[in-house]
Regions:
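Domain-edge interaction signal
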Residues: 1-195
Length: 195
């Protein structure tokens, strides 16, 4: 099996659809780009794929050493365009989509492409602090040099508190939540043929 280059992984992340269902949906923010690459690399490697590129524990968790060079290379190849707004917006231009479809996609295992699409769909719309929390919780070894670990976990606790307060804000009792949860479990068990 040939290893997937980190440049090709970047191309796939930029190419695949996100929640909007459109090819080339943008990735907003350099930290988000770095963390999506990290989560995609680790997810693929956890499933037996080999991906080149070295992430190291750094100030904001896992950091790709070659990130700047890969961004520059992707721009020079025409598969990445960076727009500047409040944040950096990384997108694949139409010519880049055509190039990736012509050159890269025919060589990629469809299951690998599905995994990359799943990562983008699941994580691209998350706020940056939640995305950091996901990466920190899934791969804690990469947080040993983090300067923002406490901030990330405080942010996660804030989200959990808001989630716990949601039923009350919506006027739903705990009993209603438990009843709905039980019904959902029963339906799931029935679908699985267990109940």
């Amino acid at each position: 099996m040939t290893a997937l280059s980190i440049l090709n992984l970047l191309a796939l992340l930029l190419y695949v659809q996100g929640k909007g269902g459109n090819k080339g949906e943008p990735i907003v923010g350099k930290t988000k780009l770095d963390k999506l690459l990290f989560l995609a690399k680790m997810t693929l490697e956890d499933s037996g794929e080999e991906v080149e590129g070295e992430f190291i524990p750094y100030r904001q968790g896992a950091y790709l050493l070659q990130l700047e060079g890969i961004i520059d290379t992707a721009q020079s190849l025409g598969i990445l365009k960076i727009e500047r707004n409040d944040e950096l917006i990384y997108r694949m231009p139409e010519e880049g989509i055509k190039k990736v479809e012509r050159v890269l996609i025919p060589k990629i295992n469809p299951m690998l492409l599905d995994k990359v699409r799943e990562i983008k769909t699941k994580y691209n719309d998350l706020p940056e602090d939640l995305l950091l929390a996901v990466a920190y919780l899934k791969y804690p070894d990469y947080t040993i040099r983090s300067e923002i670990k406490n901030q990330v976990f405080r942010s996660l606790l804030k989200y959990l508190k808001e989630f716990n307060e949601l039923p009350e804000k919506l006027g739903i009792t705990r009993e209603d939540v438990e009843k709905l949860s039980l019904e959902a479990r029963k339906r799931t068990l029935k679908r699985l043929g267990i109940a």
